């Protein structure tokens, strides 16, 4: 007996099938003008599969912004560099795209006598600079951008920290219009009148702006999460603070790294928080649109050591996914990815330990339309030191594949410091700007709607020092071969292809939005049909096996169950039944094409 209650409430979704092959489509490297150090920090992908990467590139003993565009085949279309007026270090932190193909990059740039300033640039689709907007605090202190987001009208929002020399660092959030004109600026100085640093930003559907980071609250709690909501005019609506459970003699640092907002206006924040005896733990919080805490969830990994959450994403069902790394005594640092339900209940934790039982740090996360989870970062394999490591999990937290990238240098080394980042599939920002030694480290990731995965970061080259290394992966759950079997765990459907000559992807949906049911027959489940599609190229027959629920039928009805295939040319439901397994509740049929399928019973 197999109950269908698990998928009846989710019947409109397509689900990725359980066996998936990952294919490296291309790798492109960007080496700046002096064969010196180039580090990709953020990326975005447009609807046509064009890929945009930004980072810092060394030239004449200083770093410049360097932004590149690649087409869907990985061919460079243009590269644009920006050297600020101070002719010194310029560090981009985020990239975003608008609906018209314009590209926006932000970060911090050394000014002419103004130390570091915010520097936001707009390029058109051909890489031609449209405007540069700089922000310098009146005290000429260091102004450092950490994050950016765009709205549908092309307005640009940036946030970070600004040093005013009196109250030290303050949150500083700025809104520009599409022409680069500053519309408003909002600052936040916390109750401790000390360092306050905004690390991430998000928008809701109503134009409200949400910023999070850390704020010094005083000697008792030190740095706390501080999350702020502004309306579209920059007016502060609320501030929500979170202080973890530790206190003296512990450091009591609580540092928020990432934020996202769901379709209902729920606000999710994650980072790391001092737990006292448990050291630093993941701490994830959900607020409603009024800033009222809905739940908080902490994660302490094995060994009561350092657990740092770097990124968060929420799917359309309200499940929250967090990733970062967790330290223990046996395998050092491992990726640790967690799924929470809408009430903050932990559903699963998936860890990834590379080959060396050494340091593995996840930097960013994304979720596809089927709630499969993708995580990237860098992993120590013991032989060639740090490599890119990208992991796919299904919606149950089971590891489906791991893709690693080892650059051409294969030099021993280790990246220095802690990586932090946020992801919303359009924008990624990350922490430490320069690793200390030779390695390959992935910082940023994006997905497209075709299921392709894009990863970028810094990779040590052969005589070129560090280069951008950007990778496109595709996925196939239906690979070439004979008797190829794919199984959907949600709907209990298994397909067996006689021959697949061209690999592709197969999806199964249980839906009420299909052709009318066969006349005079009842469908199982009620009023539902199965829509099955594939992009694979196949020959000969496909066997379809569907699990059914027999709780509302007699034994006589079960013995007459039919599996039917919809034929659009004749508007008929054809009987394709080959056998019934009434012990395991599976019905089988054969078809030469994929379409809508239905399990029917005579009322």
Predicted regions and their residues:
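Sec-dependent, cleavable N-terminal signal peptides
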Residues: 1-19
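A sequence-level/structural motif corresponding to short, flexible coil/turn segments enriched
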Residues: 17-476
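Exposed beta-strand and adjacent loop surfaces of beta-rich binding modules
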Residues: 117, 387, 492-494, 505-507, ...
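Proteolytic processing hotspots in large secreted/extracellular or virion-associated proteins
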Residues: 479-483, 513-570, 601
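Predominantly extracellular/luminal regions of secreted and cell-surface proteins
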Residues: 484-515
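Short, ordered beta-strand-loop transition motifs
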Residues: 489-490, 516-527, 579-586
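Surface-exposed loop/edge segments in extracytoplasmic proteins
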Residues: 569-578
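C-terminal beta-strand-rich structural cap/linker in extracellular carbohydrate-active enzymes
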Residues: 586-603
């Amino acid at each position: 007996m197999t109950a269908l209650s698990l998928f009846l409430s989710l019947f409109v979704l397509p689900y990725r099938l359980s066996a998936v092959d990952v294919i490296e489509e291309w790798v492109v490297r960007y080496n700046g003008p002096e064969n010196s150090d180039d580090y990709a920090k953020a990326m975005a992908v447009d609807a046509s599969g064009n890929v945009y990467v930004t980072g810092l590139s060394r030239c004449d003993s200083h770093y410049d912004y360097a932004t590149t565009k690649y087409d869907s085949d990985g061919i460079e279309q243009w590269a644009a560099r920006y050297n600020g007026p101070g002719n010194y270090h310029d560090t981009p932190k985020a990239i975003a795209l608008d609906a018209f193909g314009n590209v926006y990059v932000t970060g911090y740039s050394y000014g002419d006598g103004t130390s570091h300033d915010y520097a936001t640039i707009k390029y058109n689709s051909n890489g031609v600079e449209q405007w540069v907007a700089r922000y310098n605090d009146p005290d000429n202190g260091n102004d450092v951008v950490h994050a950016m987001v765009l709205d549908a009208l092309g307005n640009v929002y940036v946030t970070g920290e600004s040093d005013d020399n009196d109250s030290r660092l303050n949150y500083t959030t700025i809104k520009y219009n599409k022409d680069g004109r500053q519309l408003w600026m909002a600052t936040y100085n916390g109750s401790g009148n000390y360092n306050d640093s905004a690390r991430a930003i998000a928008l809701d559907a109503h134009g409200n702006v949400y910023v999070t980071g850390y704020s010094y609250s005083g000697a008792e709690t030190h740095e706390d999460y501080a999350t702020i909501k502004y309306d579209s005019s920059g007016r502060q609506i609320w501030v929500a603070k979170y202080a973890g459970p530790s206190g003296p003699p512990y450091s009591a640092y609580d540092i928020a790294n990432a934020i996202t907002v769901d379709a209902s206006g729920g606000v999710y924040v994650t980072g790391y928080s001092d737990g006292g005896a448990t050291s630093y733990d993941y701490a994830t919080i959900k607020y409603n649109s009024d800033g009222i805490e809905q739940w908080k969830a902490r994660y302490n990994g094995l060994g009561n050591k350092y657990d740092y959450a770097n990124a968060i994403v929420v799917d359309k069902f309200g499940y929250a996914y967090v990733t970062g790394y967790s330290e223990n005594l046996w395998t050092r640092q491992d990726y640790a990815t967690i799924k929470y339900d809408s009430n903050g209940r932990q559903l699963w934790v998936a860890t990834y330990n590379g080959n060396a039982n050494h340091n593995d740090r996840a930097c960013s996360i994304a979720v596809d339309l089927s709630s499969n989870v993708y995580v990237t970062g860098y992993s120590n394999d013991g032989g060639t030191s740090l490599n890119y490591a990208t992991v796919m999990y299904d919606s149950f937290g089971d590891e489906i594949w791991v893709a690693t990238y080892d650059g051409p240098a294969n030099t021993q080394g280790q990246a220095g410091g802690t990586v932090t980042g946020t992801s919303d599939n359009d924008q990624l920002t990350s922490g430490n700007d320069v690793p200390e030694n030779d390695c390959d480290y992935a910082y940023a990731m994006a997905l497209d709607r075709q299921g392709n995965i894009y990863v970028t970061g810094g990779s040590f080259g052969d005589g070129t020092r560090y280069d951008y290394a950007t990778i496109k992966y595709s996925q196939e759950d239906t690979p070439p071969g004979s008797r190829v079997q794919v199984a959907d765990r949600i709907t209990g459907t298994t397909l067996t292809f006689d021959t697949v000559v061209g690999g592709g992807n197969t999806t199964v949906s249980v839906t009420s939005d299909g052709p009318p049911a066969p006349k005079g027959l009842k469908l199982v489940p009620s009023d539902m049909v199965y829509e099955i599609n594939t992009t694979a190229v196949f020959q000969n027959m496909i066997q379809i096996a569907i699990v059914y629920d027999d709780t509302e039928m007699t034994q006589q009805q079960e013995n007459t169950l039919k599996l039917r295939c919809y034929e659009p040319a004749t508007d008929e439901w054809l009987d394709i039944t080959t056998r019934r397994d009434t012990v395991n509740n599976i019905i089988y049929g054969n078809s030469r094409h994929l379409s809508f399928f239905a399990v029917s019973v005579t009322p």
